[in-house]
């Protein structure tokens, strides 16, 4: 079997990262998983025609109204977040209701982080995510974000 020579794959250069767009997504009434997968897709750059898996070419995302995200079924009462304090018997469990009241940004960041690559590239892409409690994103007006209805 002979290899075809008429098809070419174009790969993006690392310098194409300069023209990063920023998007605003309202989390109010949206399901956590569906919202997170949409955000992860934008952070990775999969929505672009020039997507290259090994280059950080994704755009930035600002998520507003983080405290108004919803879960389906009985997960609102059953979902539990775990963390370790570093001490003996230091495993802690925090129910979703308490976490969304205390740290609403963490809930979305945790979900999106799980959908990105577990590499240096994934950690770099995670830096382009901003999660805001409430509907005001005035501190990000200088970057002229595009409001999405996603």
From Swiss-Prot:
Keywords: Ribonucleoprotein, Ribosomal protein. The keyword Ribosomal protein applies. One of its GO terms (molecular function) is structural constituent of ribosome. The keyword Ribosomal protein applies. InterPro entries: Ribosomal_uL13 (IPR005822), Ribosomal_uL13_bac-type (IPR005823), Ribosomal_uL13_CS (IPR023563), Ribosomal_uL13_sf (IPR036899). Gene3D superfamilies: Ribosomal protein L13 (3.90.1180.10). GO terms for cellular component: cytosolic large ribosomal subunit. It comes from the Bacteria. GO terms for biological process: negative regulation of translation; translation. This protein is one of the early assembly proteins of the 50S ribosomal subunit, although it is not seen to bind rRNA by itself. It is important during the early stages of 50S assembly. Belongs to the universal ribosomal protein uL13 family. HAMAP family: Ribosomal_uL13. Part of the 50S ribosomal subunit. This is Large ribosomal subunit protein uL13. The gene is rplM.
């Amino acid at each position: 079997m002979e290899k075809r020579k008429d098809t070419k794959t174009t790969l993006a250069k690392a310098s194409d990262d300069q023209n990063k767009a920023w998007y605003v997504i309202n989390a109010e009434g949206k399901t956590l998983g569906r919202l997170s997968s949409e955000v992860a897709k934008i952070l990775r750059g999969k929505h672009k025609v020039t997507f290259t898996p090994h280059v950080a070419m994704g755009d930035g995302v600002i998520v507003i109204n983080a405290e108004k995200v919803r879960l389906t079924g009985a997960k609102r009462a059953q979902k539990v977040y775990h963390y370790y304090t570093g001490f003996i018997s230091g495993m802690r469990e925090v129910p979703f209701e308490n976490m969304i009241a205390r740290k609403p940004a963490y809930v979305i960041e945790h979900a999106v982080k799980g959908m990105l690559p577990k590499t240096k590239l994934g950690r770099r892409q995670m830096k382009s995510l901003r999660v805001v409690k409430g509907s005001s994103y005035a501190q990000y007006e200088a970057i002229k974000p595009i409001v999405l209805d996603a």
